[in-house]
C-alpha cells in the first residue's frame, strides 16, 4: 500500500495520572518525531487505556480523544487514522468525522474473534449504516485475524480477508502478527494477497 510507514501513537484517558494538556503535549511530540522520521500516516489510539472495554467506550474517553486529535498540529499531507480500542468502530468514525481524519482502524469488523476482552463479534452492518450518514469520506482499515486474539476453530485467514472487502465494506485489509510488535507470518500475507490480488493491504 502506498503509505511508506504508519506509526501508532497512544492517548491515555486517566486524568488522575496525567492531565489532558499533558496528553496533548506528549502526543504532539510523538507527531513531530514521527513526521521527522518520514512517515506518511499516523494512527492515533487510546493504547494507554488498558484494560480495554470491549466495544463501547465512555463518553469521557470519546470527548477527550476528540479534543486531543483536534489540538494536534499535523501537516495536511500526513494521513491521520483513528483506532478506538478495543473495538469501538462507531466511536472511531465519530472522532474521525469531527476531526477530519482520513481513516479508521477497526480490529474486528466482521466475523468473531476470541480476545483478551472476551468474545468480540464484528458489527459491519451497524458501522456501514453509520458511515453512510457521515459527511466526510473516511476509509475503513480492517484487521484480519487481529493481534491478541484467535479466530473460531477452522477459520481461514484468506476467507476472512475476502469477506472483509467483499461483504464487510473494508477499504484496506491489515495483516499483523500475533501481538503488538510481533512480526507477521509471511505465509498468511501471501494467502491474503492471493485471495484479494487487487485489494489494498497494510502491514502493522
Would you name each region that the model predicts?
Residues 1-11:
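Single conserved hydrophobic/aromatic residue that forms the stacking wall/gate
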Residues 17-30, 84-91:
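Glycine-rich anion/phosphate-binding loops
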Residues 54-82, 123-142, 183-204:
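Alpha-helix-loop-beta-strand connector modules within alpha/beta enzyme cores
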Residues 87-100, 192, 201-203:
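Catalytic cores of alpha/beta
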Residues 91-172:
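Conserved anion-binding
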Amino acid at each position: 500500500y502506498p503509505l511508506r510507514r504508519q506509526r501508532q501513537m497512544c492517548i491515555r484517558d486517566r486524568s488522575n495520572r496525567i492531565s489532558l494538556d499533558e496528553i496533548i503535549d506528549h502526543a504532539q511530540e510523538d507527531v513531530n518525531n514521527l513526521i521527522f522520521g518520514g512517515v506518511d500516516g499516523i494512527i492515533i489510539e487510546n493504547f494507554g487505556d488498558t484494560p480495554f472495554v470491549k466495544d463501547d467506550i465512555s463518553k469521557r474517553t470519546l470527548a477527550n480523544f476528540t479534543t486531543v486529535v483536534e489540538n494536534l498540529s499535523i501537516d495536511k499531507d500526513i494521513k491521520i487514522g483513528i483506532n478506538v480500542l478495543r473495538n469501538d468502530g462507531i466511536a472511531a468514525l465519530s472522532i474521525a468525522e469531527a476531526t477530519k481524519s482520513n481513516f479508521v482502524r477497526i480490529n474486528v469488523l466482521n466475523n468473531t474473534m476470541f480476545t483478551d476482552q472476551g468474545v468480540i463479534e464484528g458489527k459491519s452492518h451497524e458501522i456501514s449504516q453509520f458511515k453512510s450518514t457521515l459527511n466526510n469520506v473516511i476509509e475503513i482499515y480492517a484487521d484480519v485475524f487481529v493481534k491478541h486474539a484467535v479466530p473460531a476453530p477452522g477459520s481461514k485467514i484468506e476467507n476472512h480477508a475476502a469477506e472483509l472487502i467483499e461483504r464487510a465494506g473494508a477499504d484496506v485489509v491489515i495483516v499483523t502478527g500475533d501481538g503488538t510488535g510481533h512480526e507477521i507470518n509471511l505465509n498468511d500475507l501471501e494467502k491474503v494477497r492471493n485471495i484479494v490480488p487487487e485489494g489494498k493491504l497494510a502491514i502493522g
